[in-house]
């Protein structure tokens, strides 16, 4: 299905991604973990064609992606939707209009300029928002929503493209644990119910283990781990993050229980 072969990206004399190879044969939820600067975001941007590879190739269902241009490239970006850490919504625009922006690649210039949306698309946008539990916010400005709600709007916008792949670049990095859980559960349901491939850059081990079928670890631009969640031991995590024996998974956790326990320990220590 999706094949990434020896993909490399250089910025001047700095190599951000080095000979990354990855095969996805069937729809799955794949998590990519690693410390900041490991090359996770650069890899996703190359898959989406937001950035060009220096070397290597990407193919999907036998079609070469790295050489696509113009209309064909835009069509691929509709098939391979992307959501970001900072949501990338239009703050003063209402929620449903932000979702409808997912159809821009297949609309005429005139329709885009005058915000002319077919009624069928409007109904579809509201149905998607309802599926994600935020239909009641459809007429509100995006800026009035919480971070978790805004990320679900961004997911809804991606679903308007009816993509085969969703790329999520640190989708929960700026969210509190409860909203992070809601967003990850939404992405997991989309994979399971729709049969879509979801590839998510994550910075927490517990999240990768809980929601992903497969986990890839990146360090210094290279893929250094590719396996099942249960194979992601603390020792393997140390190798991925380049950490020492004092490495603590709790420090990277988004689990509500773990964070509450950590806060309790800090409070207790303050009275010792």
UniProtKB/Swiss-Prot annotation:
Subcellular location: Cell inner membrane
Annotated GO CC locations: plasma membrane
Keyword vocabulary terms for this entry: ATP-binding, Cell inner membrane, Cell membrane, Membrane, Nucleotide-binding, Phosphonate transport, Plasmid, Translocase, Transport
Membrane protein topology class: Peripheral membrane protein
Domain ABC transporter positions: 2-245
Pfam family for this entry, one: ABC_tran
SUPFAM superfamilies per the UniProt record, alphabetical: P-loop containing nucleoside triphosphate hydrolases
EC number: 7.3.2.2
Family, as annotated: Belongs to the ABC transporter superfamily. Phosphonates importer (TC 3.A.1.9.1) family.
Name this protein carries in UniProt: Phosphonates import ATP-binding protein PhnC 2
Quaternary structure note: The complex is composed of two ATP-binding proteins (PhnC), two transmembrane proteins (PhnE) and a solute-binding protein (PhnD).
Function text: Part of the ABC transporter complex PhnCDE involved in phosphonates import. Responsible for energy coupling to the transport system.
Binding residues annotated for ATP, in chain numbering: 34-41
Catalytic activity from the UniProt record: phosphonate(out) + ATP + H2O = phosphonate(in) + ADP + phosphate + H(+)
Record GO terms (molecular function): ABC-type phosphonate transporter activity; ATP binding; ATP hydrolysis activity
């Amino acid at each position: 299905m999706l094949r990434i072969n020896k993909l490399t990206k250089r910025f001047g004399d700095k190599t951000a991604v080095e000979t990354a190879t990855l095969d996805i044969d069937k729809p799955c939820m794949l998590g990519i973990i690693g410390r900041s600067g490991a090359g996770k975001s650069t890899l996703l941007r190359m898959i989406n064609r937001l950035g060009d590879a220096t070397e290597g190739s990407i193919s999907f269902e036998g079609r070469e992606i790295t050489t696509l241009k113009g209309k064909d490239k835009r069509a691929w970006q509709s098939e391979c939707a992307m959501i970001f850490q900072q949501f990338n919504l239009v703050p003063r625009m209402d929620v449903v209009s932000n979702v409808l922006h997912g159809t821009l690649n297949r609309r005429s210039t005139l329709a885009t300029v005058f915000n002319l949306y077919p009624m069928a698309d409007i109904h579809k946008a509201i149905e998607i928002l309802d599926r994600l539990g935020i239909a009641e916010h459809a007429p509100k400005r995006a800026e009035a929503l919480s971070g978790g709600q805004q990320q679900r709007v961004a997911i809804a916008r991606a679903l308007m493209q009816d993509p085969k792949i969703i790329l999520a670049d640190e989708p929960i990095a700026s969210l509190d644990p409860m909203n992070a859980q809601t967003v990850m559960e939404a992405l997991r349901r989309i994979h399971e119910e729709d049969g879509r491939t979801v590839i998510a850059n994550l910075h927490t081990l517990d999240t990768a283990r809980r929601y992903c079928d497969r986990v890839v670890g990146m360090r210094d631009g290279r893929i250094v781990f590719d396996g099942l969640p249960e194979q992601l031991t603390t020792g393997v995590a140390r190798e991925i993050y380049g950490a020492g024996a004092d490495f603590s998974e709790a420090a990277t956790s988004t689990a509500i229980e773990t964070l509450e326990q950590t806060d309790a320990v800090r409070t207790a220590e303050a009275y010792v």
